Amino acid sequence: MANSTPAPLSYAMDTKTRAEIVICGAGIAGIAAAHELAVVHGVRNIVLVDQEPPMTLTSDKSTEAYRNWWPGPDNAMVTLMNRSIDMLESWSDASANQFLLNRRGYVYATANAAKAEQLLADAALAETQGAGSVRVYRNSTQAHTYQRSAHRGFHDHPSGADIFLDQSSIRAHFPYLAPNITAVVHARRCGWMSGQQLGMYLLDAAKAAGVTTLSGRVSAVDTSGGAVSSVMVLGADGGEHTIATSTFINCAGPFAREVGALAGVHLPLFSEMHLKAAFEDTRGVIDRNAGLVILDDAQSLHWSDEEREELAADDETLWLTLPLPAGIHLRPEGYGHNQTVLMLWDYHSTHRYSVPIFPLEEDALYAEVVMRGMVALAPGLEPYVERLPHMYVDGGYYTKTEENRPLIGPTAVRGAYVNAAFSGYGLMAAPAAGELLAAHILGLALPEHAAAFTLDRYERPEYLAQLAAWGGTGQL
């Protein structure tokens, strides 16, 4: 589905040169920003700097999904994502769907009957925030009007969400789910894509519009007089390059905090390790037409009495007997006769990293823990627990703010901008974030939601008060 390993960034730059804009980071955030500035607005002489090949540090470790289904407390995230999805759909049409955009949806499931009213309230809020109309099915007759998602593509699909509150209807439409599931929300303007293909599509267009790339690490940013004047890059050959510029964009992903410090800017960021596992579903348990399916309940893993006693006796494994967070999720990967299923459970979120560690710390139990947890969502997977299949595990970091909203816009240093803190939603947010960032840089009119993502929001007393009672962050 995706290209083979991308080629390293090109290396063709004098030791002292000038650029209109220097972008640090060739993940999806940096590439989308370069594309917006060069292709859409015609900005020339943009240099994209990264010590790794494009889209290889964290951008290629995601589940490659997108959604417009986000919590409040306002409509900023829904508005940002709706705009991103508009752009993704436009690019897909223009490229004959080169990056395989679909609209399978997100399927949120719960076995907690008491959650039904909360799901309805959340959906009503999402509707007012612009996520689309909500359709509620309380019996099988009402559910007869439900429209299934197509295997491929995104045209002619409903938006909004379908809410099932009748177990017989849930069994009819989602037969792989556990029989105790009592409510399901199928959010519809959601799906996934090939992130690698999207990144290469945008990067190729940006290069054709004049963006150049430099393989190296940003080692210093000169901000004499309170403004950006140059950027130093330690090149792949070990030589140091000075690029005179008045505009520097920090798209450094998990290293955004450290890169911000180079420019004298403090970014309130931390990172959480996230892993995902892939296996071949040779038993055909998961419907190949399924969306991204999430268990919205916390759970405790099932163990025999003997296993539980043994695990509880060791401080290193005691956590395996305790409740684990909601949000375990899976989706089928690939089309046609592909049998791959991706699974993710973000149970590492209690450990925060101020500085990310590479390579990632190993979690030797991850594959088994996720498979055991997934049985609560799809019981047909239980035979895989008894005989664990080969599972490929990789991962990266969710680098985020406390409220899990991105940083997009200027900083206190003139000419220094940030486009980071995209947590686990970088692929889906990058298009609209790049557009928003370009508006800041070029002095264009800003949409109302722009203020929700600027760094100076933390200087507003009303925002700090809102932050203290934030509620859900939408993290998966």
Question: What is each model feature region?
Answer:
Residues A178-N180, V184-T247, C251, F255:
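Helical element adjacent to the flavin cofactor pocket in flavoenzyme catalytic cores
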Residues A2-A19, T411-L476:
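C-terminal lid/capping helical subdomain adjacent to the catalytic/cofactor pocket in oxidative enzymes
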Residues A38-D60:
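Glycine-rich FAD pyrophosphate-binding loop
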Residues D281-V413:
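Active-site lid/adjacent beta-loop-alpha segment flanking the redox-cofactor pocket in flavoenzymes
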Residues M13-A29, V47:
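Beta1/beta-strand and adjacent pyrophosphate-binding region of the FAD-binding site
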Residues T79-L80, A109-A116, V185-D204, T213, ...:
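Short beta-strand to alpha-helix junction loop
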Residues N250-L292:
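Glycine-rich loop(s) and the adjacent beta-strand/alpha-helix scaffold that form part
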Residues E64-S168, P325-I328:
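Dinucleotide-binding Rossmann-like beta1-alpha1 core, especially the glycine-rich loop
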